[in-house]
Structure formats: C-alpha cells, structure tokens
Amino acid sequence: ELTDMLRGSCIQSTRSCDPNPSIKLIKEAIKSGKKFKMISVDDFPDDGIVVAVQGIGGGGPWEYVIDRTKSQGLKVLPDSERNNMVVDLISEFLGKEVTAIIRSEAAEATATALLVAAERNIPILDAGITGRAVPEVQQSIPWISGIASIPTAIVSPWGDEIIIKHAIDEYRVEDISRAIAVA
C-alpha cells in the first residue's frame, strides 16, 4: 500500500517525480522496524495537534551565507533531523505532544511525512494541506478554509530554531518564512 501511495503521489505531483528513492527509504524504514499508521480525519481527536513538515523551495540560502557558514565549519543538518526538530519545537512551544503528521504536498513530501510519523511512532493523517504543491502558504487548503498556520516552527539547515507565534496573515507568514530561508 505504501508503494502504491508513493507512486500515486508522484502522479499527483504532475512533475518529473521518481518514486523509487522514496520507496527505497520507506522499505529501509520497515526493515529497521518502523511502523506506519494512517488515520482518517474522522478519527483525529478534536484536541489533537497535527503538523505539516515541509521545506521551502524555490531558492535557498544566499551564496554568501553558504560560503560563510562553510568557512565557519557549520554543519548542515540532515533533513530528517531538522524535520524532527520542527515537531519537537512546535510541541515544546504549545506544551502538547503532536498527535499526527500531515503531508504538505505530493511527491517526495509524502515520503517525508510518512518517515517523520514513523520515526515518532505517531500516525500520518489521511489528508494533505494542498492538492499538488505549496506555491505559497496562503494558497494552502487550511488557510483557504480559515485555519491559520500560526504558530509556525522553522529550523534552518544549520539548526537555528525560529517560532513565528503571530503574523498579520498567511501572506506575512510566507514573507517571513522566505526571508528566513535565504538567511
């Protein structure tokens, strides 16, 4: 079923997506004893906390930032470590454990959500915050439905931790997040 989900997610993404690396990661996780559990939105508790773990594409740190951090010997953390740091950061900020992970978009982000959920031994929610991709935060299904993304937790490639606890609207969440992504 997971293989089918990852293949279908690549079809849904409508871009050049090779599901095989994601399938390999999921199979390795299963071999190492990880369990995958998916729950329906109907089974999600009203007081539960769900987190979408995602990256910010369309750029990245400015070249001089990359050069400087290399000269400082700063280590770039693996995505898996940063993804789990985001979940810990939001959980710590809210004072509650995260109940489930939700995928942020199709393609590789589906595998990311599955792996974070399995690593934490929590379910993935059978849903997503976008249909295909996340061009910008204010174009996500939750915001269109009146659900804000605040608070937002961000972990930089080097492990800096940032919480956006208040923003005027999702447009500002997008602006602030993009500014952090290039810093």
Give the residues covered by each predicted segment.
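Non-transmembrane, aqueous-exposed alpha-helical and coiled segments at domain scale
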Residues: 1-183
